[in-house]
């Protein structure tokens, strides 16, 4: 694409993007290995014409004093080769241009490029050393940058830190400023044309589009690469040359810092529209100073862009350490504005050249006249060596006459004009209407190295497929240079010596480029190409017109692939080169081609030292004749391949391909650490068979022994008995496996310490279960001893639950395996109803007491859910079914029937969960799900007895349960708010263990403010407990069982007494008609605590207090904890309608947020607006305001505002706030946001809201999704209902955070901070009284993101790290 727009009709695609100038990128990316030393062939030993084609490596081609190494780049009319200077041993790049393929216009452009490069002598610009010309060819000898393109550097290493990017950008600025001071405009600045030398210093290349300009005069030629082109170029206007370079510099700086392009599009029209809009995204990690510099360089109006002087004085350029080289180069540039300053001659270099035998006067004459012949080239190379190494190594001049004149033979001169010339330069091949390639006129060979394999750097770029997209480097191609030249498995094509007919016989003094043709006669004028005219040339690779350049290096890839199709099939050369691969790359599990079992790997590793000794030198000598007859008179070597793995058909690479695989997708190489050879997949079975024996004799002896042992007559009874024992053993094994799977999927694992060791020894079982469910783990489950998230050895769910797991998207299987949709399962359950046993709570890591302890799991059957939805069975409560841990008593059909109604109880997620989001979801469940879980058996020394109830003191008959009208708003039941439940509606009393009460108990109504979470318990409430180093301080199962037994009798007595007492008080108050006095009498809460809470409501419809023994004595210190259950202890209450809550990460947004925000990536700062602890939506009739409070009121009272809100939200480090609803389920509560309407096809009611189009749903957050400025937010938010401009600004700033709640990222955009703080105060102080009884939720625009940010930052736990590293970003 870049090439198409850059070259125009008839352009010379040699450099850059195949543009008009052939200089292009003269230098290649580096090879992985050390360069191969060229063969030192004296000039006298080189024949004028070889009698036979020279094989590769046997005889090096030479051009004058240069010995050619290999091809490093190709274009349509030129080829770039790396060479070694025979005198100085310096590496150079030689661009060879075929003049016969150029028209007059393009030939003038080449002369212009040579003229411009002669004017540029700068440490950060590619240096021109020498120019040679024959009747047909032009040779440009330039500096060689071994570091390759900075584009490839970004591909391999990712974006740069700003410190390193500043160093590189300063060097680029000095070079461009130097050009501008010389009245030269580059016009093709991009990452592909920025090269790196051995010290990673910048070298600007490709002056094919450069031109001389006059200050104040405009240019009109469209040239350059579209992603880096200025908007005035896209508009076809005349433009100021330096301003175009400044725009390109802004794009280059963005690419260095971000590793991506600010403007990119799938088509040229899309790219043009984005560039002309001038809007781009600033990622959150970019500093404010760098953003300011980029914004002022990428300005649509050229007159408002920064100048080079302003860029040099910018604040971002002044950061960091002092750079004296930058200051010196800038000062020299300013001195060069008027006249050219010539460097003084180096006398040491001149003396060294005299010692070599070169005439000093001839050297001085060459330097003064800018001859750019071999004298000036040697001088320049020695000067560079002296600057770098401070040493000169004069060597003997090759055996050539000092006059450097050669008389070419007559036959050679005739051959140069004939067809025997083998110096091949690629030539444009036109495409006819039938899409057939037309052979060019003449019989000139196009390429001297048609049989060359592509260079490694060319393959790396080709595999990344797009030059303007940062891809993943492929270490398979990083082979040693001495092994590149002849890849095994392919017959080498012997190229003919391309330059031998020219080099030794060239008369340099007569064939030098004429000086008069290089000097401009006044102002050079060339016919300008039409603006945006589509080129008429088409390449072979189908990448678009002129898609290749001399710098591309991939010109021979297509031909190479075609040659592979014609050759015999075999192992791919890219894979068979494994001994030379220096780097070890981790295995990508998602693209791996099947993992072998552990035993096979161990056998292979134990015997891999023998793998080179398996083959026998003379196999027939060791094979007996009778065995040879059995083998069909075939030698052992011919039987190496199994019948199904013959060389023509075996799978030698990770993809089924018998040719050079050129994938279009990006991938990580899938070679394993243990691969000792590329054919390990093919030889694996053979190695396992032959690993223990290296000789056929051993196998034959073992076979004879087996025949002796089992070859005799065997009793039939013995065989029958053995067969029966085998069948019994198989049945027993199958039964045990089935029991283990059922037990693991239903009951949590036991907390005994031996289970930790068993878990550590069974990673393969977990992997097997994940593969059985077709779930690819995002990361292997850790085996840390204190990891409470991955304690069970196998958390495989029942088969019916796989539908729920896969419907969530790419959830993290290590945290959510076997966990169905929370909102779907528990949306309409009453509070005293517990989750079904199939949910096993595997991610909580809280384990059961012992095998012998009976467990009562309360579950709600589908009939209850249907009755709740229909509103018919009002008094239906959860039924408790005692389930024994022994799996033999559990029927799979019953378990499947329990799981069936939950499989479709939620909407599928709109996008996959990232590992970081899954971690946040686990954080929310771990922190708040064991609501009524008394941790006395874990940490008995941390809790006082007087404020703690018994661990299992809660039962469904305690009276804290929610009535079935909780789930649906049933109008007939609203008329009887205090009607007591009948005896038939109360579930029977079953003894429950402390573990089940901890896992399945509802949220307690409120937390007194003196309850704190100890630091050692904070790890249990955090998903990163395994990373904090906390040890496991839980009681052994025996002591825990004894503790449960001691408390059972006391608990039952206490429950009976309390129930009788509460019933007496209930009837007494009902008879007296005093419903208000229920609050202090039934709740058991003293008036001191009531006075300390600002949200106290004495209305009987809003009872918020229950017995203190149901209060969990732990909560996070600095986190907004879970909300209470706003229901009376007895009787029906007027409950607020419930809003549907999505099951997992992104879809659990409240519907109000979906109205207000078009992108869920902004939910980091705005999700808490609707579910804020300050927003209480449970107002009763005639009492709209008592429950409403503000943060200021809460802080004045010295408490956190989470005493009585039903919608208290926890701000975790991730995007997802935990929701606590009026439901008492243990996993996730929904927020009472909007009225529950008619249920959908899944039986779940969805709140009525304005229809929002699908494009407003969120997209996956990329690395740079922050909008450039606030105007972009206004455009997107104007059509959204209820979204204020302040919230739009907050949304624009929120996208900077990239889902990381840290001080630096959240507050990174400071431009709207002051006004948002002011708006925050107004909103919090004055918005609440306006709420009426019918208001179900507050619009998110009333609470700007910055207000929520302050709340999140103020309640962040001091010990929890909110860094990007732990978040997995």
Swiss-Prot record:
Phosphorylated at Thr-221 by STK11/LKB1 in complex with STE20-related adapter-alpha (STRADA) pseudo kinase and CAB39. Its EC number is 2.7.11.1. Residues 344-384 form the UBA domain. The active site is at 188 (proton acceptor). Activated by phosphorylation on Thr-221. The modification Phosphothreonine is found at residues 71, 221, 469. It catalyses: L-seryl-[protein] + ATP = O-phospho-L-seryl-[protein] + ADP + H(+); L-threonyl-[protein] + ATP = O-phospho-L-threonyl-[protein] + ADP + H(+). ATP binds at residues 72-80, 95. Disruption phenotype: Mutant mice are born at the expected Mendelian rate, but 90% die on the first day after birth. The surviving animals show dwarfism throughout their postnatal life. They exhibit marked expansion of the growth plate and articular cartilage regions in the limbs, accumulation of chondrocytes in the sternum, ribs and spine, and impaired skull bone formation. Although chondrocyte hypertrophy and bone mineralization are markedly delayed, the body size is unaffected during embryogenesis, dwarfism appears as animals age. Its cofactor is Mg(2+). It is found in: Cytoplasm. It is an enzyme of class 2 (transferase). One of its GO terms (molecular function) is magnesium ion binding. Residues 66-317 form the Protein kinase domain. Keywords: ATP-binding, Cytoplasm, Kinase, Magnesium, Metal-binding, Methylation, Nucleotide-binding, Phosphoprotein, Serine/threonine-protein kinase, Transferase. Residues 26-55, 775-821, 942-993, 1314-1338 are annotated as: Disordered. Residues 803-818, 981-993 have a biased composition (Polar residues). InterPro entries: Kinase-like_dom_sf, Prot_kinase_dom, Protein_kinase_ATP_BS, Ser/Thr_kinase_AS, SIK, UBA. Residues 46-55, 944-957 have a biased composition (Low complexity). PANTHER family: MAP/MICROTUBULE AFFINITY-REGULATING KINASE, SERINE_THREONINE-PROTEIN KINASE SIK3. Belongs to the protein kinase superfamily. CAMK Ser/Thr protein kinase family. SNF1 subfamily. This is Serine/threonine-protein kinase SIK3.
């Amino acid at each position: 694409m870049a090439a198409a727009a850059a070259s125009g009709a008839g352009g010379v695609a040699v450099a850059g993007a195949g543009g008009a100038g052939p200089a292009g990128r003269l230098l290649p990316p580096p090879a992985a290995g050390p360069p191969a030393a060229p063969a030192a062939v004296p000039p006298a030993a080189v024949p004028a014409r070889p009698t036979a084609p020279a094989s590769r490596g046997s005889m090096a081609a030479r051009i004058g004093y240069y010995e050619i190494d290999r091809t490093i780049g190709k274009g349509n009319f030129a080829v770039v080769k790396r060479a070694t200077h025979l005198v100085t041993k310096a590496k150079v790049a030689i661009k060879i241009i075929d003049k016969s393929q150029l028209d007059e216009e393009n030939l003038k452009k080449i002369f212009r490029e040579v003229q411009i490069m002669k004017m540029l002598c700068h440490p950060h610009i590619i240096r021109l050393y020498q120019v040679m010309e024959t009747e047909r060819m032009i040779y440009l000898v330039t500096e060689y940058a071994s570091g390759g393109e900075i584009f490839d550097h970004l591909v391999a290493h990712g974006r740069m830190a700003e410190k390193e990017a500043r160093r590189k950008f300063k060097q680029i600025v000095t070079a461009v400023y130097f050009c501008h001071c010389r009245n030269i405009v580059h016009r093709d600045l991009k990452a592909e044309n920025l090269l790196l030398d051995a010290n990673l210093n910048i070298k600007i290349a490709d002056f094919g589009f450069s031109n001389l300009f006059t200050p104040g005069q405009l240019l009109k030629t469209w040239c350059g690469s579209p992603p880096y082109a200025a908007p005035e170029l896209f508009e076809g206007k005349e433009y100021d040359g330096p301003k175009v370079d400044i725009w390109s510099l802004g794009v280059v700086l963005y690419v260095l810092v971000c590793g991506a392009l600010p403007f990119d599009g799938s088509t040229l029209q899309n790219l043009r529209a984005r560039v002309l809009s001038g809007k781009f995204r600033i990622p959150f990690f970019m500093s404010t100073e760098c953003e300011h510099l980029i914004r002022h360089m990428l300005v649509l109006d050229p007159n408002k862009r920064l100048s080079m002087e302003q860029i040099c004085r910018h604040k971002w350029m002044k950061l960091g350490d002092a750079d004296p080289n930058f200051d010196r180069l800038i000062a020299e540039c300013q001195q060069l504005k008027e006249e050219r300053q010539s460097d003084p001659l180096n006398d040491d270099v001149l003396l060294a050249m005299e010692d070599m035998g070169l005439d000093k006067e001839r050297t001085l004459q060459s330097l003064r006249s800018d001859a750019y012949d071999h004298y000036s080239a040697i001088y320049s190379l020695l000067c560079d060596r002296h600057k770098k190494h401070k040493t000169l190594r004069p060597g003997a001049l090759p055996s050539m006459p000092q006059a450097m004149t050669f008389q070419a033979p007559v036959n050679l001169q005739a051959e140069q004009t004939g067809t025997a010339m083998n110096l091949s330069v690629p030539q444009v091949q036109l495409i006819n209407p039938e899409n057939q390639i037309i052979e060019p006129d003449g019989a000139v060979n196009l390429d001297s190295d048609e049989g060359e394999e592509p260079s490694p750097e060319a393959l790396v770029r080709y595999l990344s497929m797009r030059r303007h997209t940062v891809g993943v480097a492929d270490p398979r191609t990083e082979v040693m240079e001495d092994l590149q030249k002849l890849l095994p498995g392919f017959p080498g094509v012997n190229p003919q010596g391309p330059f031998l007919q020219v080099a030794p016989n060239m008369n340099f003094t007569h064939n030098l480029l004429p000086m008069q043709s290089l000097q401009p006669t006044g102002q050079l004028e060339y016919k300008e190409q039409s603006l945006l005219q589509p080129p008429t040339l088409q390449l072979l690779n189908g990448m678009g017109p002129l898609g290749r350049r001399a710098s591309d290096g991939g010109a021979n890839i297509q031909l190479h692939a075609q040659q592979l199709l014609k050759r015999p099939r075999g192992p791919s050369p890219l894979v068979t080169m494994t001994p030379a691969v220096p780097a070890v790359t981790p295995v990508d599990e998602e693209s791996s081609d099947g993992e072998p079992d552990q035993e096979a790997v161990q056998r292979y590793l134990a015997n891999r030292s023998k793998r080179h000794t398996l083959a026998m030198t003379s196999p027939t000598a060791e094979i007996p004749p009778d065995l040879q007859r059995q083998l069909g008179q075939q030698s052992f070597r011919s039987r190496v391949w199994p019948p199904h793995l013959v060389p023509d058909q075996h799978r030698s690479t990770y993809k089924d391909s018998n040719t050079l695989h050129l994938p279009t997708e990006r991938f990580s190489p899938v070679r394993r650490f243990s691969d000792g050879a590329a054919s390990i997949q093919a030889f694996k079975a053979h190695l396992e068979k032959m690993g223990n024996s290296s000789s056929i004799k051993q196998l034959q002896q073992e076979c004879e022994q087996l025949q002796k042992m089992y070859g005799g007559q065997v009793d039939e009874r013995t065989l029958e008995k053995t067969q029966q024992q085998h069948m019994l053993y198989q049945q027993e094994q199958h039964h045990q496996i089935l029991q283990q799977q059922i037990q693991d999927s239903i009951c949590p694992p036991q907390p005994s310490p031996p289970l930790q060791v068993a878990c550590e020894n069974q990673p393969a079982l977990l992997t097997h279960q994940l593969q059985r469910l077709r779930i690819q783990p995002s990361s292997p489950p850790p085996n840390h001893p204190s990891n409470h998230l991955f304690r069970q050895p196998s958390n495989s769910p029942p088969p019916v639950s796989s539908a729920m797991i896969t419907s969530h998207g790419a959830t993290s299987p290590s945290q959510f395996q076997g966990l169905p949709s929370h909102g779907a399962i528990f949306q309409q359950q009453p509070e005293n109803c517990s989750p079904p046993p199939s949910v096993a709570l595997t991610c909580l890591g809280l384990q059961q007491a012992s095998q012998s302890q009976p467990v009562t799991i309360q579950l709600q059957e589908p009939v209850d859910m249907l009755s709740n939805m229909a509103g018919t069975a009002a008094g239906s409560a959860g039924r408790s079914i005692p389930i024994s841990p022994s799996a033999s008593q559990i029927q799979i059909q019953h378990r499947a029937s329990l799981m069936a109604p939950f499989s479709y109880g939620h909407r599928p997620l709109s996008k996959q969960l990232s590992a970081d989001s899954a971690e946040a979801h686990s954080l929310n469940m771990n922190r708040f799900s064991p609501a009524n879980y008394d941790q006395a058996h874990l940490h008995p020394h941390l809790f006082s007895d007087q404020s703690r109830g018994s661990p299992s003191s809660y039962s469904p008959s305690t009276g804290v349960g929610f009535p079935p009208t909780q789930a649906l708003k049933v109008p007939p039941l609203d008329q009887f708010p205090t009607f007591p439940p009948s005896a038939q509606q109360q579930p029977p009393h079953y003894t429950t263990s402390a573990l089940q009460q901890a896992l399945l108990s509802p949220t307690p109504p409120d937390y007194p403010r003196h309850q704190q979470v100890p630091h050692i318990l904070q790890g249990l409430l955090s998903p990163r407990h395994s990373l904090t180093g906390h040890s496991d301080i839980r009681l052994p199962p025996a002591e825990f069982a004894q503790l449960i037994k001691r408390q059972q009798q006391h608990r039952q007595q206490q429950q009976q007494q309390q129930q009788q007492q509460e019933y007496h008080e209930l009837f007494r108050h009902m008879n007296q008609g005093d419903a208000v006095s229920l609050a202090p009498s039934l709740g058991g809460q003293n008036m001191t605590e009531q006075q300390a809470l600002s949200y106290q409501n004495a209305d009987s419809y809003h009872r918020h207090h229950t017995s203190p023994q149901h209060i969990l004595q732990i909560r996070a210190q600095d986190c907004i904890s879970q909300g209470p259950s706003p229901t009376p202890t007895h009787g029906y209450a007027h409950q607020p309608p419930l809003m549907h809550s999505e099951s997992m990460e992104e879809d659990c947004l409240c519907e109000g947020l979906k109205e207000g925000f078009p992108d869920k990536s902004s939910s980091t700062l705005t999700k808490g607006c609707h579910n804020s602890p300050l927003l209480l939506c449970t107002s009763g009739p005639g009492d709209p305001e008592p429950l409403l409070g503000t943060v200021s009121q809460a802080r004045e009272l010295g408490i956190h505002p989470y005493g009585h809100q039903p919608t208290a939200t926890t701000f975790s480090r991730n995007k997802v706030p935990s929701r606590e609803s009026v439901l008492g389920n243990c996993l996730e509560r929904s927020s009472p946001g909007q009225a529950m309407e008619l249920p959908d096809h899944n039986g779940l009611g969805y709140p009525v809201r304005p229809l929002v189009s699908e494009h407003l749903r969120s997209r996956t957050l990329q690395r740079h999704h922050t909008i450039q400025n606030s105007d972009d937010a206004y455009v997107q938010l104007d059509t959204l209902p209820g979204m204020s401009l302040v919230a739009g600004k907050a949304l624009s700033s929120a996208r900077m955070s990239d889902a990381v709640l840290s001080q630096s990222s959240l507050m990174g955009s400071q431009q709207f901070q002051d006004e948002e703080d002011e708006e925050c105060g107004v909103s919090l102080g004055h918005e609440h009284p306006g709420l009426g009884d019918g208001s179900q939720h507050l619009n998110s625009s009333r609470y700007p993101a910055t207000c929520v940010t302050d709340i999140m930052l103020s309640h962040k736990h001091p010990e929890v790290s909110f860094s990007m590293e732990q978040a997995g970003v």
